Amino acid sequence: MARAIILMADSLGIGAAPDADKFGDIGANTLAHLLKAYYDETGTALSLPNLSKLGLIDACEAAGKEPCLVSNRSASQGAWGYAKELSSGKDTPSGHWEMAGVPVLFDWGYFPKTQPSFPQEFIDELIARTGIPGILGNCHASGTTILEQLGEEHVKTGKPICYTSADSVFQIAAHEESFGLEKLYQVCETARSLLDEMNIGRVIARPFLGSNNQDFARTSNRRDYSVLPPAPTLLDVLAKDGGEVISIGKISDIYAHQGITQKHKAPGLINLLKKTNELMQSAPDHSLIFTNLVDFDEMFGHRRNPVGYAKALKEFDDYLPTILNALKADDLLIITADHGCDPTFPGSEHTREYVPVIAYQPGMTDIPLGERNSFADIGQTLAQWFNLPALEYGDGFIDKLTTSK
């Protein structure tokens, strides 16, 4: 029986989506622009031989209609295409859920006011239920900038830092030692229950350490509290069929722990990839290994650091042969993304972009998949791969994969 491995390169968009104008994202192209920024700073094109060989650069140039500056480019030996998003938003849950067959066709709740951002009744109830002395922030903010601005006051007062963004999200930052990690999680759980009626997609715990605003840094103990997907996803269907659904990184949180049979955490890009390789050695047949590579988005996309993003992508490319060499004959590798986050774009938010659809099996030859009308095409393909009932959304391309070897 078959296995599948998904490497979700969080935020690796490859060109503005057809509806990018509705999001203020005309001209966005995460991959092409970080490659250009790297070239402009270093004078050399980034070498991504393994991702190039799988078709990532072909997909980016087809989707974004602009050149991708890479060296050591070789002909594709994988199936490659690009998908537009059917969901109404450009957020993390929408992208992940749609990829698993459940697009978000409703509108999330948001906090549109930049400051103060949150309803006073909600703040009052959160304080009453948790016993916190108040909150700091109450605004739209960059998660790193707000630590510099309010971290010391938080440590002195015990008031957690609460902030949001253009996404449907409520984020709480607190010091792991002075405030306490478990206390932070408890406050987040209370906030989650209060925000359900507002249809806020995620509450995120953002713990940090450090002694002053010069060295405050987030830790790896982030936790996401998502609402439940509105319908069963591919993960639920596979788990119900007796399969293993192995979450690595924040995947389990994003799917609100639905359809997950194993949960594994690892700090940082390379450790996430190493954990993936480790579990590929032991995962039984009829398993899905699903890894979110969050650093691309969190460390470089939102922080608008294109050269750092490029260097991280190079680390991914360098490790990729280890993953490829671990593939068995009946394994299918998928590399994709959940949205864009162009590090050269104004602001600090996600960007509405096409995402890569890369599929690879040992022995595969070049096969263009073209433009896909939904991220759900990936989920439908995996349903076919695992011989599961068809999902409601998505146009599978398994026939192209099985005839291309």
Swiss-Prot record:
Subcellular location: Cytoplasm
InterPro entries membership: Alkaline_phosphatase_core_sf, DeoB, Metalloenzyme, Phosphopentomutase_DeoB_cap_sf
Amino-acid positions noted as binding Mn(2+) 2 in the UniProt annotation, renumbered to this chain: D297, H302, H350
EC code(s) of this entry: 5.4.2.7
Chief location category: cytoplasm
Pfam families, sorted: Metalloenzyme
Comment on bound cofactor: Binds 2 manganese ions.
Cofactor: Mn(2+)
Intrachain disulfide bonds: none
Record GO terms (molecular function): magnesium ion binding; manganese ion binding; phosphopentomutase activity
Domain of life: Bacteria
Keywords: Cytoplasm, Isomerase, Manganese, Metal-binding
Pathway per the UniProt entry: Carbohydrate degradation; 2-deoxy-D-ribose 1-phosphate degradation; D-glyceraldehyde 3-phosphate and acetaldehyde from 2-deoxy-alpha-D-ribose 1-phosphate: step 1/2
A cellular component term, taken from the record's GO annotations: cytosol
Binding sites annotated in the UniProt record for Mn(2+) 1: D10, D338, H339
Transmembrane region(s): none
Catalysis: reaction(s): 2-deoxy-alpha-D-ribose 1-phosphate = 2-deoxy-D-ribose 5-phosphate; alpha-D-ribose 1-phosphate = D-ribose 5-phosphate
GO biological process, one term: 5-phosphoribose 1-diphosphate biosynthetic process
Role summary: Isomerase that catalyzes the conversion of deoxy-ribose 1-phosphate (dRib-1-P) and ribose 1-phosphate (Rib-1-P) to deoxy-ribose 5-phosphate (dRib-5-P) and ribose 5-phosphate (Rib-5-P), respectively.
Record family assignment: Belongs to the phosphopentomutase family.
Protein name as catalogued: Phosphopentomutase
Lineage of producing organism: Bacteria, Pseudomonadati, Pseudomonadota, Gammaproteobacteria, Alteromonadales
